[in-house]
Amino acid sequence: MKADVFDPRALREAFGAFPTAVTVITASDPAGRPVGFTANSFTSVSLDPPLLLVCVAKTARDYSTMTAAEHFAINILSEAQKDVSIKFARPLEDRFAAVDWARAPNGCPIFAQVAAWFECSMHDVIEAGDHVMMVGRVTAFKSSGLNGLGYARGGYFAPSVAAKANSSAAGGEIGAVAVLERHAALFPLGDQNLSLPRYSAAGGDPAKTLASQLERSGLSVHDWLSLLDL
């Protein structure tokens, strides 16, 4: 698609093809109350000095409070924290009530059981269209060793679960759990005894192996689901 006028929905979907981590940005308002919201446009910037960056929509709740704060924190959610992401993506009045959290050295809320957290001083706020880029200088951080939650094409996924599934299939058997729909009738994939097809996985990508075997059976295989919606 060319030109600089795009269908916003199509552009958003294209951006969404890039898998990201899921974070909750937090800070305190002038009265000391915690504020925060979910964001996935996050990246490291520099080791020396230690800088990171997060993009915030100008329509975000608490946008003014967040961008005016002297300090803010980034909570990188772990694989088990999909519910936290959903809570902080919604306009709930007291989102912090359902989360186990504490104050970082400069007072920013940090969550328990996250993959990592960073508390930052505000280094710069850069205008960028309908967003701003908040650049933070890291003043404190901690990494728990837990795996981070992933997000792509509108769905959450757990990288370690996907890796274990691929690893398990690589040395054993893989199978199809699906049905075909033809003229409003459903047909299980399998033999006449209605068992599901299974194939030996000697190595390589299990999904590609399964697709190849099914195509040999005369089936057209496309649109493989690559995300695990937990």
From Swiss-Prot:
Keyword Lipoprotein: no
Alphabetized UniProt keyword annotations: Oxidoreductase, Plasmid
InterPro entries: Flavin_Rdtase-like_dom, NADH-dep_flavin_reductase, Split_barrel_FMN-bd
Record-listed E.C. numbers: 1.5.1.-
Superkingdom of this protein's organism: Bacteria
Top EC class, one word: oxidoreductase
Recorded GO MF terms: FMN binding; riboflavin reductase (NADPH) activity
A Pfam cross-reference name: Flavin_Reduct
Family label: Belongs to the non-flavoprotein flavin reductase family.
Function of the protein: Reductase involved in the catabolism of stachydrine (L-proline betaine), a source of carbon and nitrogen. Part of a Rieske-type oxygenase system that catalyzes the demethylation of stachydrine to produce N-methyl-L-proline (monomethylproline). This subunit is probably involved in the transfer of electrons from NAD(P)H to the catalytic subunit Stc2.
Oligomer and partners: The system is probably composed of an oxygenase subunit (Stc2) and two reductase subunits (Stc3 and Stc4).
Protein name: Stachydrine N-demethylase reductase subunit Stc3
Species assigned in the record: Rhizobium meliloti (strain 1021) (Ensifer meliloti)
Gene name of the record: stc3
